[in-house]
Amino acid sequence: MIEFDFGVVLAQWPMLAHGLVLTVALTLASAVLGTALGIACAWARLHGGRALRSATSAYVEAVRNTPFIIQLFFIFFGLPSLGIRLSVEVACVLAMVLNLGAYACEIVRAGLQATPKGQLEAAMSLALTPWQTFSRVVLPPALARIWPALVSQIIIVMLGSAVCGQISAEELSQAANLISSRTFRSFESYILVTLVYLALAMALRQCLNWVGPRFIFTSR
Amino acid sequence: MKFKLVSSLVSLVTTAVLTVATPAQADDSLNAVLAKKSIALGVASDFPPYGFMGPDFKLTGVDVATAQLIADKLGVKAEFVPVSTPNRIPYLQTKKIDLIVSALGKNPEREKVIDFTIAYAPFFQAVFGPKALNIKSFDDLAGKSIAVTRGTIQDDMLQKVAPPTLKIQRFEDDSTTVAAFISQQTQLLATGAAVAAAAVQKNPQVQAEYKLLLKDSPNFIGVRKGETALLTKVNEILRAAKADGTLEQYSQKWLGRGTGVLPE
């Protein structure tokens, strides 16, 4: 008969709280930087010169066709042999930004390409510069179109940060691992952390759905 | 957790089966070995630096050297039988081997089913680091970073003895822990002697050496219960080898550290 004991696991809450803070911090940093990178890459794939276009698509294909954990290990264990030594947190953010950037690039590009031709012609007839056209006419409605897909991708990256524990980042799943190896209460530890992730993902979705229309793109 | 359960189950079953299946042994192994002019020695073949396959496909290591020494002193041929951690005690009990020389630790459960000689080699959990780093005591660890495998004895020990400013970075398995140290993501490494020796051997560029002891759990040779004549003879050989420095030399050669005080 299995007996549950959540008490000993809950007693370790400072560790869990610490992990939660790091997971949220990693997610916020990589969501902001990764989305910016994604937009830049989407622009580069559509409007950049030939060299820039092929460099961007090489990056996007490399990231989208390799596992996240391998990218993370490459940055943390591989780069030092080239003399680049990053701290655990920086390595995690870099891996998450590069990962989100590649997926966001394709999502944003879909939004940009769906811009009706008439809007571009209208912008041109108003003598807007290419930059004004992109930043004022094309991008905001494109972001509005792809926002739900982008939010899902950000949540996937947040959940993917669980892997960062593998390079000793003390995020949420690492905290759960530590608690389970200290209390020998693995079931309770993982149930608890599952609920925390679930709550976190739902809160993040609500939050981004609220922030998007108000600050990122202004819906009509 | 799972492993713990399985291993305790295995030892429980082994104990139960063996106490039932093997009544008092006849004390005749030493004579049998001398008559046959060969002794069957259970050694590990995949556990450097204790028992492992050398580049020339011959078994080598501290255990293999010690086992060879015993055979030589008995004046018989050494017949090496590769054993694994779960099967070595059953092999001894069923007379497939005469001695276990495979990084065997002594504990009360095992003492119920087999006899132990005196200790012949150290086995230890320790802190390792580059030669350039001066670490003489646990206080010297302050402000440094160290890689350790999560939930191991080393992890627990570090938490107890290390200064709070030591940055303990925990990884999921030995190979990731070692990778973090080898790629110099951490300054130090806390692990078992076997893992560290293999890591240092394969990555000579890091210039790693033994720094501080975390926990000692020396190795003993296992003998079938009741084989007092063989046990006494092996103990004689081991004491002589201890006195003339042979065991010390083996330890220095493979573990990079002296035997220290080995328990009788």
Regions found by a protein language model. Give the residues of each.
Chain B
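Extracytoplasmic small-molecule ligand-binding "clamshell" domains
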Residues: 26-103, 244
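Ligand-binding clefts/hinges and TM-proximal coupling segments of bilobed small-molecule sensing domains
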Residues: 28-29, 153-170, 207-210, 239-264
